[in-house]
Amino acid sequence: MSTVKEQLIQNLAPDEKQSRCKITVVGVGNVGMACAISILLKGLADELALVDADENKLKGEALDLLHGSLFLSTPKIVFGKDYSVSANSKLVIITAGARMVSGESRLALLQRNVTSMKAIVPGVIQNSPDCKIMIVTNPVDILTYVVWKISGLPVSSVIGSGCNLDSARFRYLIGEKLGVNPSSCHGWVLGEHGDSSVPIWSGVNIAGVTLKSLNPAIGSDSDKEQWKTVHKQVVDGGYEVLNLKGYTSWAIALSVTDIAASILKNLKRVHAVTTLVKGLYGIKEEIFLSIPCVLGQSGITDLVKVNMNTEEEALFKKSCDILWNIQKDLQL
């Protein structure tokens, strides 16, 4: 006797086995799931894979999404502990990593996350050798270097989420101060995604009018309007959210999805993301920091050489030195 499916449906052509635009998110914690839902709501992928070592948490999160399939345009969501589920991904987003425990040094946390990357990256590359990898796990700049080293991928294919969010916070806060939508506020935060990030005040502009031309002291200690507090709010913003709700998730997820769209849709938009800066601004070490990068299907296709003033360049090099002093002691 025929099954209900056999009586109802007549097949005309075989299904395509391979997705055209598959994204994998590694890590189903708060950031990973915020990235997943943001990607799904933007309709960036025709297949989304979730990978995590915690099978119960993974299954629960995946089922919760699958039960909402009717409301999503992504036809396929898969999940598993094994990296075979990520096979043939165009983009792999790594959000998994250890959290700092009380009394732990930054270097000790970093070393634990290096161990995590050593466990994650080989499985990713084995199943998706031509993928682009985006690192979100902190400290993102050094871990982008680590993933580049472990993966063997070209530098253009390994991208850190970097200062894309810092720059977005910067533009939002400038907009709040001026009463202008952040999309019309143009400015960059570069260097480390963290305390030593560098606001490029010399280039901040609205409709081509640089704020420095109106206030030459902008961003400095002598600025009577104290615009430098804007950058302080950028640096403190993540900590404030962390203290209030226990973690950050939505802003970083929206930032990650914005970067992913530029890569997967070949948009050639410019983002402040983490990449190799050796050879720029006199830097001789293999350091990864955020600079403006053009993103497309090949990953990072071009670098934008920012004309920093003397003070900004000095701060950028200081940011580089801070990271190098940590990175040089890493055991890979």
UniProtKB/Swiss-Prot annotation:
Modification Blocked amino end (Ser), positions: S2
Key words, A-Z: Cytoplasm, NAD, Oxidoreductase
Keyword flag Endoplasmic reticulum: no
GO cellular component terms attached to this protein's record: cilium; cytoplasm; cytosol; mitochondrion; motile cilium
Catalysed reactions, as listed in the record: (S)-lactate + NAD(+) = pyruvate + NADH + H(+)
Pathway: Fermentation; pyruvate fermentation to lactate; (S)-lactate from pyruvate: step 1/1
EC code(s) of this entry: 1.1.1.27
Residues that coordinate or bind NAD(+): 29-57, 99, 138
Subcellular location: Cytoplasm
Predominant localisation class: cytoplasm
Binding site for substrate: R106, N138, R169, T248
Pfam entry (one): Ldh_1_C
Residues at the catalytic site: H193
The keyword ATP-binding appears for this protein: no
GO MF, one annotated term: L-lactate dehydrogenase activity
Alphabetized InterPro entries for the sequence: L-lactate/malate_DH, L-lactate_DH, L-lactate_DH_AS, Lactate/malate_DH_C, Lactate/malate_DH_N, Lactate_DH/Glyco_Ohase_4_C, NAD(P)-bd_dom_sf
Superkingdom, taxonomy of origin: Eukaryota
Function, as annotated: Possible role in sperm motility.
Family of the protein in this entry: Belongs to the LDH/MDH superfamily. LDH family.
Subunit and interaction comment: Homotetramer. Interacts with RABL2/RABL2A; binds preferentially to GTP-bound RABL2.
UniProt name for this protein: L-lactate dehydrogenase C chain
Source organism: Rattus norvegicus (Rat)
Lineage: Eukaryota, Metazoa, Chordata, Craniata, Vertebrata
Gene: Ldhc
